[in-house]
Structures are given as structure tokens and as C-alpha cells.
Regions:
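Asp-box/WD-like beta-propeller blade repeats and closely related beta-sheet repeat scaffolds
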Residues: 135-188, 197-217
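Beta-strand-rich domains and repeat architectures in extracellular enzymes and scaffolds
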Residues: 25-40, 51-90
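Conserved blade-ending motifs and adjacent loop-strand segments that build the rim/top face
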Residues: 288-312, 348-380, 393-394
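Short coil/turn segments at the loop-to-beta-strand junctions that recur within blades
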Residues: 59-62, 106-115, 153-160, 205-209, ...
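Short beta-strand elements that form the blades of beta-propeller/WD-repeat-like
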Residues: 28-32, 72-85, 121-122, 127-134, ...
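Bacterial Sec-dependent N-terminal signal peptides
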Residues: 1-33, 94, 130, 146
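Blade-loop segments of beta-propeller domains
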Residues: 58-63, 67, 94-135, 152-157
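Repeated scaffold domains used in trafficking and secretory/extracellular systems
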Residues: 65-70, 114-121, 157-167, 209-216, ...
Length: 426
């Protein structure tokens, strides 16, 4: 295992990250969250892109989507993942991005050799493979036709919380807290060959500590749909919420499969919680690229478990980046009863940062449909959302004039039992 980071550089980067008020003369882009909080304004869809598309997903008997799905959009496909009720069996469905046509079901949960543990997937678009986790240390592979294609067995003993698949590597993000309440080693990124052998690691900016299980008096697994208005897309795949009785820490939120690594073009980005810098991963180096200037709302990493003064602190929850913008969501007052979720937008061309309260919605000024609810970004750089058919029909009942809107022609043939409508902004 290679750990040939220069210690002085790591100390410098850490200092740079946790004190976001100082740019130290580096050329990183600055997202001015502090100023955006002083000048809140409502975001519009036209701020996010120029074109909005609606893709109603086909509704065949074997492609009916269950409740609380996670929707991902690839270059040519739409992936929908959900757990059935009440059996909690994981399902992964594949649709055409072009017209919403149902293509196939991908794999299954279970105990047989081809089964996966969790239906949440990661994609190698070049080789056209899906990867699913299989406990304790494997990823199961399927192709885009739903055919089982083997497995990757990692040389390390635990699976990561999130993976990014590149042309030659599998990069795992370890958030340290697993479903089993067992903490991992003190590295945050593991860089693997495609055969699962570990090449090198990137150390965490801070040390994780294990709580005593006696201190946990309540644990809840909550689905992402119920949590959206509190935490946004950060918890889109659901989250464990732990309540404690000691240690001065009454609550901890651990989202499932939180995307802390992503690609923008060929750049691999990484951001660790409570660190105010987005880094570009280059080999075994972290290069500061974008800084969140939180100013008086800064949350010191050493106080990340505290609930004191959190109403005056900002937590950067979710980040989506393309060539033009960085769209992010942040929470003021995390871990309190008075938390507020904000949508943030950084325009790369102008350098302007805009924030708005999530409860105000993002006005659709392009096609005049329902307020846009960001749920992620496609691998092509489109912001993604979806609405259930019944939600769209309820809205149409209150806005009957929309029937004559040519941009919303999909509403004419919509049935309340139909699959959701995927929305893309580019």
C-alpha cells in the first residue's frame, strides 16, 4: 500500500480547508456562501440551464416503479432503484434516456452467487457495467442487458459507502460509519485496480472515534423522500439517524451512499464533510480546486459533533457540478429542531453565488411547470429531478390552463398509476 503523501503538504491542505475565510493566495474558485446568505433570492430554472426536458417512463407490468425510488441518469440510460414493500427486496430498472422506454431489470437481491446485497448501483459507462455491493467485500457486475458478468473481490475487509468507476480504477469513499456500527480504518479514499487490489489510500482530514453502543438509545433508518425537505439530496438514498444519551452528542446523521466523489469531465472531485474545500484527485494527490467561503457560518471540524451554536453554522450537504455551474445544498442549524435547507448556485463564468431557501422552491420559468426539485446530476452534466404521476395530475387540477402548454404535452395522456416523469435541465 502506498502512502507517499508529503506530510507538510497534507498539513497545509488541512489548514487551508478548515479555515475557509482565507484563500492564502491560491487560485481556487471561491463560492461565497456567507455573502449569499446575506442576500437571499429565489432561484429560477433558467439560472440552472437553458433547456428543460420531460421524460415519462414507460409503465409495463414488469417495470412498475415502487415508492421512494432513487433515480440516476447516465449518458444513454435512466436507472431507477427502490426497495419493495413490505419485503424490502431491492429492484434496479433500466430505461431509455431518449424516450423513457423500459429496457430491462438488472440483477436481484438475495443469497445466490449472482445476487447483490443492495440495489444501489455504480456505473462504468465505458465498459457498460453496473456494480452492486455484496457484503462483506465484493461488488457484483451486470451489463446493460441485465446479464451477470462476475464480481470484484476487494483485498480490504470492508466495502466503501460510495464508489466512482473510472476507465482503469475503482475509487471508494469511506465515510467511516457502516450499517453495522463498525468504524473503518482512518483513510477516506481507497484507490483500487479493477481486480479489487488496493493501489493506494488518501488519509482522512480528521480522526473518527467509535461511540459506545451503550450510548445509543435509538436508531432509525429513514427513507430519503421523507428527509428531503430537511437534508436535501444528501440523504436521497436514506439515512441512519442515531440518538445518544452521553458524550455531549445527542444526534448523528449517517446518509447511505452519499456522493462525496464525482467526475466533471475528466476531473475527479472529492469533498469530505466539514472540510470547506473541493479537491481534484490526481494520482495520490489532492489539489484544492473550489472553496466554500462560509465566513461567520463556518463550522470548525473539531466541533463537528457539537450541537452548540449550530443555528449559526452552515453544513455543505450535497454538491452537483458541470462545466457551467456548481449547484449545492446546505443546511443551517444541522442537528437542531430549527434547521433550514438552502439551495445554492455558483456560476463559474461570472463567479456569482446565489442562495435561496429550499421551501421557496425553484421556479420553472422555462416551461411553467411545478417548482423544480433537484435530486442529482447526470453523468452528462444535466440536473435531474422527477415527479410522480399523481403529483403532476394534482398540480394540473389546480392549473388547468397548463393543458394548452405545448411544453407540457406529456400531461395529456398521463395516468395516476403511471411511472414517474424524469426531468432534466441542461
Amino acid at each position: 500500500m502506498k502512502r507517499n503523501f508529503v506530510i507538510i503538504a497534507i498539513i497545509f491542505l488541512f489548514s487551508f480547508s478548515v479555515n475557509s475565510q482565507k484563500n492564502n493566495g491560491m487560485s481556487s474558485a471561491v463560492i461565497d456562501v456567507e455573502n449569499g446568505m446575506k442576500n437571499l433570492s429565489r432561484l429560477k430554472v433558467s439560472d440552472l440551464g437553458k433547456i428543460i426536458r420531460y421524460i415519462p417512463l414507460e409503465t409495463p407490468d414488469d417495470g412498475l416503479i415502487g415508492k421512494n425510488p432513487v433515480v440516476k441518469v447516465l449518458r444513454n440510460y435512466i436507472v431507477v432503484e427502490y426497495n419493495t414493500l413490505p419485503t424490502q427486496q431491492g429492484v434496479c430498472l433500466l430505461f431509455s434516456k431518449k424516450d423513457g422506454r423500459f429496457i430491462t431489470k438488472i440483477g436481484h437481491t438475495g443469497q445466490d452467487p449472482e445476487a447483490y446485497t443492495d440495489c444501489f448501483s455504480w456505473t462504468d459507462e465505458k465498459e457498460e457495467f453496473f456494480y452492486f455491493e455484496r457484503q462483506p467485500n465484493q461488488l457484483i457486475k451486470y451489463d446493460m442487458k441485465g446479464k451477470f458478468c462476475g464480481k470484484v473481490e476487494f483485498s480490504t475487509s470492508e466495502l466503501a459507502s460510495y464508489y466512482l468507476i473510472t476507465d482503469s480504477e475503482i475509487i471508494g469513499f469511506f465515510d467511516a460509519f457502516k450499517k453495522s456500527n463498525i468504524y473503518t480504518n482512518q483513510y477516506v479514499l481507497g484507490i483500487y485496480k479493477k481486480d479489487g487490489s488496493l493501489k493506494e489510500t488518501v488519509p482522512s482530514f480528521f480522526t473518527y472515534s467509535s461511540p459506545h453502543t451503550d450510548d445509543i438509545y435509538q436508531t432509525n433508518l429513514v427513507n430519503g423522500n421523507l428527509l428531503y425537505n430537511i437534508f436535501g439530496s444528501w440523504t436521497r438514498a436514506g439515512a441512519f439517524i442515531f440518538d445518544y444519551v452521553r458524550l455531549g452528542q445527542r444526534r448523528q446523521i449517517n446518509p447511505l451512499h452519499s456522493a462525496r466523489i464525482w467526475k466533471n469531465n475528466e476531473n475527479i472531485r472529492f469533498k469530505q464533510d466539514f472540510i470547506d474545500t473541493i479537491y481534484t484527485v490526481s494520482g495520490n494527490k489532492l489539489i484544492p480546486s473550489i472553496v466554500f467561503k462560509t465566513g461567520k457560518y463556518h463550522w470548525p471540524v473539531q466541533e463537528r459533533k457539537s450541537e452548540k451554536n449550530n443555528l449559526e453554522r452552515i453544513f455543505i450537504a450535497d454538491i452537483n457540478e458541470n462545466n457551467s455551474i456548481v449547484f449545492f445544498q446546505c443546511v443551517r442549524g444541522l442537528l437542531t429542531q430549527e434547521s433550514v435547507l438552502y439551495n445554492g448556485l455558483y456560476n463559474k463564468k461570472t463567479g456569482k453565488t446565489t442562495l435561496s431557501k429550499n421551501k421557496d422552491g425553484i421556479e420553472d420559468d422555462l416551461s411553467h411547470f411545478m417548482p423544480f426539485k433537484p435530486l442529482g446530476m447526470s453523468t452528462s452534466g444535466e440536473l435531474v429531478s422527477f415527479v410522480e404521476a399523481w403529483e403532476a395530475l394534482d398540480w394540473l387540477e389546480k392549473h388547468p390552463e397548463a393543458k394548452n402548454n405545448k411544453n407540457l404535452s406529456f400531461l395529456k395522456d398521463l395516468d395516476e398509476e403511471a411511472n414517474p416523469i424524469v426531468i432534466l435541465i441542461e
